[in-house]
Design a protein with these regions (language model features):
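Intrinsic-disorder-associated, low-complexity terminal segments enriched in Asp/Asn/His/Tyr and depleted
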Residues: 9-11
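Active-site-adjacent structural elements in enzyme catalytic cores
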Residues: 14-328
Length: 328
């Protein structure tokens, strides 16, 4: 009995060691490509990113070209440690250090004033720089091995549904792009973005780290800037995160009526419901994968039931509002 148990444990250790060796080789290959100015895709806890050497303007331009992304739409810089901030930000205010100590590594992006020498291609030509320290172990291993910052927007065509699985990235970019496997993304929605370039912090994009949690850590409320009064950040355009099939957002409780109306008009529709009691974190984790699945069904429209209006649904509600082509 004891020897059998020991044999099982030995086998598991061998499998784990072999898996670690394979991943180490893949990360080494990714680092080689990054240093050569090429692009790689890798997992984070939010979505899969399309990475480039953040110090290489030519590589950064490749990101914009491959995604079809406007050159004025900034990229998020990914770092391994908060200690690296001083190389990228002109100043690191105490508020930034407080939030980093509480929420990094994790799905929080801070917008700071950029340091001299930071490429315009990284910031979309504006002064502020957006930066975060991801929590996913593969992302962290890649950043540690690379030894510098990696710029990484979501690994999809601009404006489309973000990828939360390696297979999603390959669907977007079937050519010879190295994709590091990391399983399904744990969070599934993009990071919360907070600007600290002024005296009062501003919430620029909602995420799973809530405004209330940020305010509690800082001891002050966050402002929501008016349109055009804040730095440009990823995912801030009115139309974004959209499947190719037009998406219609339907008020809660009216999905059945919307289905009947669409079918009476001869439409083939697919649906995504949000039943009472649905957990916000689970919904957000699965949202993009489900939208991608529905997008392949050959329907004329995707009908999505609106999510609750409570604070824990802010991120999902924001993404659906931007993904929607029409509203009921």
């Amino acid at each position: 009995m004891t020897s059998r148990r020991r044999g099982t444990h030995d086998h598991r250790r061998t499998v784990v060691a072999a898996s670690m060796l394979v991943m180490t080789k893949k990360i080494d290959a990714a680092v080689t490509r990054l240093r050569a100015g090429e692009l790689v895709a890798f997992p984070t806890e939010t979505v899969y990113g399309l990475g480039a050497d953040a110090r290489n303007p030519v590589a950064l331009r490749k990101v914009y070209a491959l995604k079809g992304r406007p050159a004025t739409h900034p990229l998020i810089l990914h770092l391994h440690s908060v200690d690296e901030l001083v190389s990228w930000a002109a100043e690191v205010p105490p508020m930034a250090l407080r939030l980093a100590a509480r929420f990094w590594p994790g799905p929080l992006t801070l917008v700071l004033r950029r340091a001299a020498g930071v490429a315009d291609e990284l910031t979309g030509g504006q002064d502020p720089i957006a930066v975060r320290v991801p929590a996913h172990p593969v992302a962290r291993a890649l950043l540690a091995a690379f030894g510098s910052g990696i710029a990484a927007p979501s690994a999809n065509r601009y404006g489309r549904v973000s990828p939360t699985r390696a297979a999603h990235v390959r669907e977007e970019f079937p050519q010879d792009l190295l994709v590091l496997e990391g399983g399904d993304c744990e969070v599934g929605l993009e990071s919360t973005i907070v600007s600290l370039v002024g005296a009062t912090p501003q919430l620029l994009r909602p995420g799973v780290i809530s405004s209330a949690a940020l305010a509690a850590e800082l001891g002050m409320s966050l402002q929501t800037p008016t349109s055009g009064a804040a730095p440009r950040v990823p995912g801030s355009t009115a139309q974004h995160y959209a499947p190719q099939t037009p998406l219609t957002l339907v008020p809660a409780g009216r999905l059945d009526t919307a289905i009947k109306t669409a079918q009476a008009g001869g439409e083939l529709v697919v649906t995504l419901a949000c039943p009472p009691g649905t957990d916000a974190a689970s919904y957000g984790r699965a949202l993009y994968a489900e939208l991608r699945r529905l997008d392949k069904q050959g329907a004329s429209r995707i009908l999505v039931e609106s999510v609750p209006k409570s604070a824990d649904w802010d991120a999902a509600r924001d993404r659906l509002a931007r993904a929607a082509a029409t509203f009921v």
